[in-house]
Amino acid sequence: MDSAEKKLDLSPIELAKRLACHMAVDENYPENPKVIGIGSGSTVVYVVERLLTKPGVDSVVFIPTGFQSKQLIVNNGLRLGDPDCYPNVDVSFDGADEVDDNLQCIKGGGACLFQEKLIAFLAKRLVIVADSRKNSHVLGEYWKKGVPIEVMPMAYASILPQLVELGAIEPKLRMGAPGKAGPVVTDNGNFIIDAHFGLIKNPKELFAKIKLLVGVVEVGLFCDMISAVYFGSKDGSVTVKKASGEKHIIPAPVTAAANEVDAKVAETNAKPLN
């Protein structure tokens, strides 16, 4: 454990995510990048932490997928951009709720799925980082909260029964945290429905059916979009899966040596976002 990890006092799961993030950035940081996408969720803090150590990072434009990642970019003094101004993204780093053996995944637990899908579509490479709990054979095996679906507010009531017809088990409108009355509202002013379909053996077919429903803005099924995924395990190893079919496991001693980072940088990025 390096000095930064001691100061941060990371749990085994957080350390696993951090190791996986550092390796993902090291292996996928392009030569002379111009635009990089920054996803949402708990892993992206460690992604940015590693990006700050890369050469030429000050000249790179970073595109966020939501408010959290926007604040992360700004608070670290990086250049902020929008997808309408920079539609060509070299690589995007993001997290996931669950990834299956075919690198299809469920995303949107943080209610940013439309922006995440847009940046993933614009990116030449989508690199996913998560802890090993998100690694499954079939979608729905471990993630039981359902497929997030962003919908127009006026359409949610009509969409719920149609999702049941498609096989959803008690789909629900996602409600806000205890401090907020009413449903979760996305950055785009829409609602989120969480629809659990059990084991999803054909994500592409399910995605197509849901997307056709009137009022659906986006579906949290990311099909045939991932270039590589990095899963961090509690033992410090990192499992790497690529769209080419390549799969390998990097043992803990290697990841520990490869992911030393300056303690000051780590402390800076560990501070709460404003």
From Swiss-Prot:
GO terms for cellular component: cytoplasm. Pathway: Carbohydrate degradation; pentose phosphate pathway; D-ribose 5-phosphate from D-ribulose 5-phosphate (non-oxidative stage): step 1/1. The keyword Isomerase applies. It is found in: Cytoplasm. GO terms for biological process: D-ribose metabolic process; pentose-phosphate shunt, non-oxidative branch. It comes from the Eukaryota. Keywords: Cytoplasm, Isomerase. Pfam families: Rib_5-P_isom_A (PF06026). It catalyses: aldehydo-D-ribose 5-phosphate = D-ribulose 5-phosphate. GO terms for molecular function: ribose-5-phosphate isomerase activity. Its EC number is 5.3.1.6. Belongs to the ribose 5-phosphate isomerase family. This is Ribose-5-phosphate isomerase.
